[in-house]
Regions:
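Hydrolase active-site cap/lid region
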Residues: 72-122
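Catalytic histidine neighborhood in serine/cysteine hydrolases
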Residues: 164-182
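Conserved alpha/beta-hydrolase
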Residues: 2-24
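Short alpha-helix in the alpha/beta-hydrolase fold that links the catalytic acid
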Residues: 153-163
Length: 205
């Protein structure tokens, strides 16, 4: 993803969220963006305060579970635009789908989420990505999702897109026919890069 953007003429900052890659391991848990979005905001603040970027010239890319951190960061900033690929936008839906995929009854979703919050010490439903979709305003967003994604259903991107559209946000949804999870960047690289670069070129100032 970084190379697609840099080859398209964009300065690109790649970050590892807490407990990932080269970043510090501060706990044994992943907080589904509820804490990690602060890492994105830290990078955003650094670009503004140390490098002199304008908020409206900064865009976000979120992939899969990382989309939650991007969405929550967008909600608490003036970031100019956001690109999401195979996004999670409804955590309870993820839990229900995963339970069903594993052969367990979906009514276990609620107690599973409650137990997750108790284990992590963080309310993992405190922020709601679908609520954010109604508050994006005139900023542009672009959602990409493979129609055959077996891990994160297209319903996530479709619901987020529909809420954003109803709130008069300029939202685009690209459903890739037959695509899997984060599959478009590999299966349709040229088209993917063209869409990505065009989107940010037109969306950032």
């Amino acid at each position: 993803m970084g190379s697609l953007l840099s080859n398209g003429g964009f300065n690109t900052l790649l970050i590892d969220l807490r407990n990932n890659g080269y970043s510090e391991n501060v706990s044994d848990f992943f907080y589904l963006g509820q804490m990690e979005y602060n890492d994105v905001l830290g990078a955003y603040d650094w670009l503004i305060e140390e490098r002199g970027y304008l908020p409206s010239s900064i865009g976000l890319v979120g992939l899969s579970t990382g989309s939650l951190s991007a969405i929550y960061a967008l909600d608490e900033s003036d970031i100019g635009a956001m690109w999401l690929d195979s996004a999670i936008t409804d955590f309870p839906l993820v839990v229900r789908n995963e339970l069903g995929r594993l052969g367990y009854p979906e009514f276990l979703a609620s107690p599973t989420i409650t137990m997750g919050s108790r284990m992590t010490g963080v309310d993992i439903t405190e922020r709601d990505a679908l609520d954010v979709a109604s508050r994006i305003g005139d900023r542009n967003i672009y959602l990409v999702h493979g129609s055959d994604d077996s891990r994160i259903s297209t319903q996530h991107s479709e619901n987020f897109h529909n809420i954003a559209i109803n709130a008069n946000t300029n939202s685009t949804l690209w459903l890739i026919d037959g695509g899997g999870h984060i599959d478009g960047i590999w299966a349709h690289t040229i088209d993917y890069q063209n869409r990505l670069v065009t989107f940010f070129t037109n969306s950032l100032s």
